[in-house]
UniProtKB/Swiss-Prot annotation:
Family annotation (InterPro entries): Hirudin (IPR024793), Hirudin/antistatin (IPR011061), Prot_inh_hirudin (IPR000429)
Glycosylation site residues: T52
GO cellular component term of the entry, any: extracellular region
Sequence segments annotated as region (Interaction with thrombin active site): 8-10
Modified residues (Sulfotyrosine): Y70
Protein function: Hirudin is a potent thrombin-specific protease inhibitor. It forms a stable non-covalent complex with alpha-thrombin, thereby abolishing its ability to cleave fibrinogen.
Annotated region described as Disordered, given as residue ranges: 47-72
Keyword Secreted set for record: yes
Localization annotation: Secreted
Source lineage: Eukaryota, Metazoa, Spiralia, Lophotrochozoa, Annelida
Predominant location: secreted
Family to which the UniProt record says this protein belongs: Belongs to the protease inhibitor I14 (hirudin) family.
Alphabetized GO MF terms: serine-type endopeptidase inhibitor activity
Protein name (record): Hirudin variant-2
Organism: Hirudo medicinalis
Amino acid sequence: AICVSQAITYTDCTESGQNLCLCEGSNVCGKGNKCILGSNGKGNQCVTGEGTPNPESHNNGDFEEIPEEYLQ
């Protein structure tokens, strides 16, 4: 899965994978974690491993949405 837009900063999903994290969607994993895509785009997990870049975090949320213009 290709995670999108390095121009946007993201915070990290939890290492335990209890939070959803969409690659090729509205959210991406941070902190060098990678997404494991679930069925039907649901139940995605963020786990430790190479995959997404290490973007800077600027708040305490688990992830940030990509602005709609990136999703068209």
